[in-house]
Amino acid sequence: MNESQISYDASNLSTNNKKNNNIRKKFKLSLYQLQKLALLGAGSSGEVYLVQDTQSKIKLAQKTVRYTEDEKTKNQLETEVKLSTLLKHENIIRIYATYFLKGKINFVMEYMDRGTLADLLKKIKKIPEKYVGLITYQVVKGMAYCQKEKRIIHRDLKPSNILVNSKGEIKIADFGVSTIVEGSWAQKKTMIGTYIYMAPERIDADIYYINCDVWSLGIIVMECILGFYPYIIYNNNELPNSVWIVHELIENNPVPQLDKNIYSQELIDFTNQCLIKDVKKRPTAAILMNHPFIQKYSNLSCDDLAIWLKTIN
């Protein structure tokens, strides 16, 4: 493949321009047609830009990662490239193209104009239960697809890897540290991911199961509801600064509980199910799809979330 030319599937790209309604499903896109509009974010390994295809006027996100000989980084990049061809679901961020140019790996993907769930939490601290339900329903759908159909463990599910757009759509992103399992478990070779969201078996066991992401989801839901990381109540209201402190907090304390006088029994039971310490008793995402808390919001549309998002600057 020529470095300046890529091919990707544009069949489900959205556009407000009526002239673009008949965009061909497959087309060639010159990299020189991608115009950078803004820097969306930057980290130690690269940047994310808002770009626009100058022909179709479609806005996309372009993640640029500096290529390195570091084995860990190479493995993550290779995993993300591989999974970009496997994952096609309405609640998984769609990567339309990957290419290598001037020492950098680039991912061209759909643009989520409301940023991440972490961005949302920074603005409003905590989210009303109804909207947590609408968000969680979509995340669980994406997780169930990954676990049941693709046998994929994300391994780094957290608010900054859950993306939001103004249409009320929620999508899981960043599968760089994910793994594919043949059965229901994987052998731990390295401790990878963000430790405050890690399931206890990810920290101290030689193997972990496909439902380890469910623990991460439980922590995320609690954080959205409470406005803070739930286990800080056992740590002098401070965020733990090491994986071993997280492990001690989980092992030596009961699972944090939501106030039954404030929150619904469905939500309380949902978080309790997600945060079962015994991995063999913790449900999978597919089982959670039938939980009353998820079913409660399954008939509502993304529009309900979109209307609420309009109230947040």
Sequence positions of predicted segments:
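Conserved short submotifs of the Hanks-type protein kinase catalytic core
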Residues: 103-116
